[in-house]
Amino acid sequence: MISVNDFKTGLTIEVDNGIWRVLDFQHVKPGKGAAFVRSKLRNLRTGAIQEKTFRGGEKVAKAQIDNRKMAYLYADGSNHVFMDNESYEQIELPEDQIAHELKFLKENMEINIIMYQGETIGIDLPNTVELVVTATDPGIKGDTSSGGSKPATLETGLVVQVPFFVNEGDKLVINTTEAAYVSRA
């Protein structure tokens, strides 16, 4: 059991018969009344996001999850195949279970598979990934002084806002939690 006062981003807990990852939390101490913790949680089985409020000091069960390092191999219809590089064991995950993460996956990319009681429930991406720009408008001289941005389509189909100096074929570092441009690679 863990106190809600000890919440950290990325912590995995068991609440309401589900396995949830803490995405965000805020300790609130109102002038009147008891303190509470407002949290934003993602269900690791369904991908649903829920906001939940806990009373200060309330205890919740910490989920015992295992992470296995695997490589993304390929898409097979609506399933995606991953392989353990040590045992060469392959597993398939349905597209709807990892829909958010698919925007960042490239073939042969190393990721962590999240396991709970022997069941595969999702994947953990690195904080940043390197992706190549496949389509964007050309930058026009003088545009950089305004500090604006333009949309760019990346090799996985993800569209992000990038600075005007980015061109097709550039390799970019992308933040996976915010789906945002970080820098050139």
Swiss-Prot record:
CC terms in the record's Gene Ontology section: cytoplasm
- Location in the cell: Cytoplasm
Which Pfam families does its entry note? EFP (PF01132), EFP_N (PF08207), Elong-fact-P_C (PF09285)
Question: Where does the source fall among the domains of life?
Answer: Bacteria
Principal location: cytoplasm
Keyword ATP-binding annotated: no
Q: Which GO-annotated molecular functions does the record name?
A: translation elongation factor activity
Keywords carried by this UniProt record = Cytoplasm, Elongation factor, Protein biosynthesis
- Could you tell me the Gene Ontology terms of the biological process aspect for this record? peptide biosynthetic process
Q: In which pathway does it act?
A: Protein biosynthesis; polypeptide chain elongation
Q: What does this protein do?
A: Involved in peptide bond synthesis. Stimulates efficient translation and peptide-bond synthesis on native or reconstituted 70S ribosomes in vitro. Probably functions indirectly by altering the affinity of the ribosome for aminoacyl-tRNA, thus increasing their reactivity as acceptors for peptidyl transferase.
Family membership: Belongs to the elongation factor P family.
Task: State the protein's name.
Answer: Elongation factor P
Q: Which organism is it from?
A: Listeria welshimeri serovar 6b (strain ATCC 35897 / DSM 20650 / CCUG 15529 / CIP 8149 / NCTC 11857 / SLCC 5334 / V8)
